[in-house]
Amino acid sequence: METTVRKQKKNLETKKPSIYSLQLHEMQDWLKEQGEPKFRAGQIFDWLYKKRVKNYEDMSNLSKGLRDKLSNSFDITTLKTLVKQTSSDGTIKFLFQLYDGYSIETVLMRHEYGNSICVTTQVGCRIGCTFCASTLGGLKRNLEAGEIVAQVVEVQRALDETEERVSSLVVMGIGEPFDNYDNLMGFLRIINHEKGLHIGARHMTVSTSGIIPKIYKFAEEDLQINFAISLHAPNSELRSKLMPINRAYKLPDLMEAIKYYVNRTGRRITFEYGLFGGENDQVEHAEELAALLKGVKCHVNLIPVNYVPERDYVRTPREQIFLFEKTLKDRGVNVTIRREQGHDIDAACGQLRAKERKEETR
């Protein structure tokens, strides 16, 4: 019997690219190289994203020769569902295993306006935010575009059972999306494409901790995707304590990049502000935050801290959260308090984490 480690080693040695990593034009180019007509790309995308088949044999309007070429060139089974947990509020957390034995978490959230999915872009994270579980083990590797796409496909398959659909997505799972920029953009274009899952750009949100060069690059992209910044502090000193990335990308420089983005795109930006008891949740912090954001086309999303066993932060009292919100509103800041979802299954903001690959036990 093969052990887990031997299976993982075999997977690494024989791994093929994921078919979900290909954009439509890339599929057309590949078909041309194979001597196949490019219109087949649309048929293949239809099987992948509309019918959501799990193997090439089900692609019945393709020749056996083409199905064999696809099978020999691309993996179609990208993720394996290990665990599926359902919260008391209907939130579902999926634990997916990757080809190399690592596992990632993806979350489906229920809203009155539809179903939203929170996707992961990396195995672990290098950013080191002091309140987040995702960074505890450091960064293991980037996900391929197809591994990000496959998260949405797998969740949509689960929703197919009740004839529901993923209507929006947020790139706020494990990892720093802008550290995996090219795969992130490939994923977004595939998901947005009319031949793909066709989720509208304005129904997608990307969040970053503040990789400044990529903010400027993102401002030049042709997708009208919503953009969020994990801010969490109104000044550089406090932000450096909470988020070490601020030592590399200073808050004043970050604000300049944000203003450029807003001016270049005309789009409103969202600032995510986690509230940590006794750290960044006082009235003076709210006043300082309002001053920092003055004149910026933005929205502030207040996030009560979620429990992480390895972290020491405590939740801000409810009355203090409301006072913080009121202080911002009184100063003209557009602000809301995020609705908590999935807290009881560790699926809320800051609680997702990558799992190590299993060690050989026999």
UniProtKB/Swiss-Prot annotation:
What the entry lists under InterPro entries is as follows: Aldolase_TIM (IPR013785), Methyltransferase_A (IPR040072), RlmN_N (IPR048641), RNA_MTrfase_RlmN (IPR027492), rRNA_lsu_MTrfase_RlmN/Cfr (IPR004383), rSAM (IPR007197)
Where does the UniProt entry say this protein principally localizes?
cytoplasm
Q: Which Pfam families match?
A: Radical_SAM, RlmN_N
Indicate the residues that form the catalytic site. Answer: E105 (proton acceptor), C349 (s-methylcysteine intermediate)
- Quote the catalytic activity from the record: adenosine(2503) in 23S rRNA + 2 reduced [2Fe-2S]-[ferredoxin] + 2 S-adenosyl-L-methionine = 2-methyladenosine(2503) in 23S rRNA + 5'-deoxyadenosine + L-methionine + 2 oxidized [2Fe-2S]-[ferredoxin] + S-adenosyl-L-homocysteine; adenosine(37) in tRNA + 2 reduced [2Fe-2S]-[ferredoxin] + 2 S-adenosyl-L-methionine = 2-methyladenosine(37) in tRNA + 5'-deoxyadenosine + L-methionine + 2 oxidized [2Fe-2S]-[ferredoxin] + S-adenosyl-L-homocysteine
Q: Which cofactor does it need?
A: [4Fe-4S] cluster
- The Radical SAM core domain covers 111-344
Which interval of the chain is the signal sequence? Answer: none
Instruction: Name the job this protein performs.
Output: Specifically methylates position 2 of adenine 2503 in 23S rRNA and position 2 of adenine 37 in tRNAs.
Which family does this protein fall into? Belongs to the radical SAM superfamily. RlmN family.
Its protein name is Probable dual-specificity RNA methyltransferase RlmN
Species lineage: Bacteria, Bacillati, Bacillota, Bacilli, Bacillales
